[in-house]
Amino acid sequence: MNRDLTKGSVTKSMLLFAIPMILGDLLQQCYNIADTLIVGQFLGRNALAAVGSSFTLMTFLTSTILGLCMGSGALFSIRFGQRDENGLCEDICASFYSIAAATVLLNVIAYLCLDTLRVFLHVPDEVWGDMRAYLSVIFMGIPGIFLYNFFASFLRSVGNSMVPLVFLAISAVVNIVLDLWFIIGLKRGVGGAAEATVIAQYLSGIGIAVYALLRCPQVRSIRRLRSLRWERIGEILSFSTLTCVQQSVMNLGILTVQGLVNSFGTVVMAAFAAAVKIDAFAYMPVQDFGNAFSTFIAQNYGARETGRIRSGLKSAVCISMAFCLVISALVFVFARPLMTIFVEAGETEIIQAGVQYLRIEGAFYCGIGCLFLLYGLYRALEKPGMSVVLTVISLGTRVALAYLLSAIPAVGVVGIWWSVPIGWLLADALGVGYYLARRKQLTP
């Protein structure tokens, strides 16, 4: 069901639209958690470190696709708010072929550079065998990731956040069942975990594509387009590429830090692999809320509903900050039990390192919550370049401080953990300051 976010209660509209997105991303995290949990319990610390490092790499690679889809989705929302059906159809067509081409290119590059990644990420010898086996399979799922994210972005842009949730729920269940069968039953090792994830990704991608083709008139009407204007492709690419750059820079910084983490050995690698899953799971709802907020702002920006934009911003800040405060308290208190979900209780060194990470990051979730709102705001107001600037500041600070602080013997790996919230807070300060200085021009 499509939801017109330019009408009705501001807070209620955002929350009802955001809840399926949050639930959907919870299920998306189940892909990764299923791999990590089963691998950690049944295949050992080296396999856990391999899958954890692979997850960071895959996040970087798929961020290219995700960024392009998010950028296109923002334009779709603006067209929907403007009631420009023909323009929406042209944007869908132009973005689909552009992102499909980028996906094919990304897949080729990933396979060609597979062995080079070992040097860049400083992967230890005892981990590389499992990591290579996992990556060589998981790369096959990149086209499935494209299909799901493209059509999910389109459906959400017109206010339908429920259908992406349904397809993701089905694929999440399939992923977990296949994980158990391939790893425990068939003894296929880390390759089996990758195979389970790839099958689930194609199931969700093909399923949602078929649904959109059958049920959405905007997608079906693409067949009536006589030609595709190059200026439309240029507009899509100029906007989506900036969003893509923002996502890629963000995850490149994370990938660079992963290489630094790997240099501290298998114990820290395994701790980081488990803790980063918990960390992402904890703040993921505010990330999804930021994306839902972005769609709300974009539709109202297209409809020139300035009052709803400002009301929505105030409401979103209150909701996001309240949630972050609660989650920060829970993660701080339950950090150790959360680590034992992924790591055997006897692995005390791994658990201690993970608890340290979680308590430092978790204390500053309000910082990342604010940053996600800023990303969504500037994307919706057709200022994706500002999102790139904020990302460069956040990740640049994180990477620079991580290397500087961790090189001090008295600080060590703790310096990597502290670099993250410092980067969040600096980016927040700039993003909020820019909006306050330019709000009359941004939302006239």
What is the role of each PLM region?
Residues 16-35, 137, 148, 171, ...:
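Transmembrane helical elements of multi-pass membrane transporters/channels
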Residues 1-18, 76-141, 185-241, 297-364, ...:
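Short alpha-helical transmembrane segments in multi-pass integral membrane proteins
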Residues 48-108, 145-164, 271-335, 368-390:
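Small-residue-rich hydrophobic transmembrane alpha-helices
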